[in-house]
């Protein structure tokens, strides 16, 4: 989902596990709404920068353990997220902010170009694995590698995304 408003609608209609993939810059009102949602459902937010993670932690300090964080990885679309080799900076910001890091995610939007799904699927797999492996190597417990687009959903190798439906990520 892209907005807190979308999450509110889904939770109001029974969803109990939601992930806001669009980068948020959380203010006081958004923090209040996320806290209320976290009382009713499992909530995860994406972090694409160290600054964004720090802001999220500052705004949600009292609810940090109740809200999961996945770091957005740029797998070749170059729209948002960090390169796999930059993931540690964001992870440390997530940890310093007291947030609960559970994994990494990507959206291979470039897979929609003609003839690109196979190449984009491989880039997605490699980016998720490189980022997750770097985090695990320094002690971050990563339970989720989230990815997929319509063109790459069925192309993900066994060692790629652990899920394309957020519910499958362990907590």
Swiss-Prot record:
A GO molecular function annotation here is: D-serine ammonia-lyase activity
Matching entries from PANTHER family are given as:
D-SERINE DEHYDRATASE, ZGC:162816-RELATED
Q: Cross-referenced Gene3D superfamilies, in alphabetical order?
A: Alanine racemase
Matching InterPro entries, A to Z? Ala_racemase_N, D-amino_acid_metab_enzyme, PLP-binding_barrel
Q: Which GO annotations describe the biological process of this protein?
A: D-serine catabolic process
Q: Could you identify this protein by its name? A: Uncharacterized protein Mb1448
């Amino acid at each position: 989902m892209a907005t807190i408003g979308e999450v509110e609608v889904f939770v109001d209609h029974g969803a109990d596990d939601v992930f806001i993939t669009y980068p948020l810059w959380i203010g006081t009102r958004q923090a209040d709404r996320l806290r209320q949602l976290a009382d009713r459902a499992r909530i995860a937010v994406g972090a694409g920068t160290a600054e964004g993670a720090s802001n999220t932690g500052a705004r949600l300090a009292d609810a940090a353990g109740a809200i999961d964080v996945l770091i957005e990885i740029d797998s070749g679309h170059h729209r948002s997220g960090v390169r796999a080799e930059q993931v540690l900076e964001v992870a440390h910001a997530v940890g310093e902010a007291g947030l609960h890091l559970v994994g990494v995610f990507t959206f291979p939007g470039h897979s929609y170009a003609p003839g690109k799904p196979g190449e984009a699927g491989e880039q997605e797999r490699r980016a998720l694995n490189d980022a997750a492996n770097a985090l695990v190597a320094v002690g971050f417990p990563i339970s989720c590698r989230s990815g997929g687009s319509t063109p790459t959903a069925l192309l993900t190798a066994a060692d790629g995304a652990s899920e394309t439906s957020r519910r499958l990520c362990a907590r």
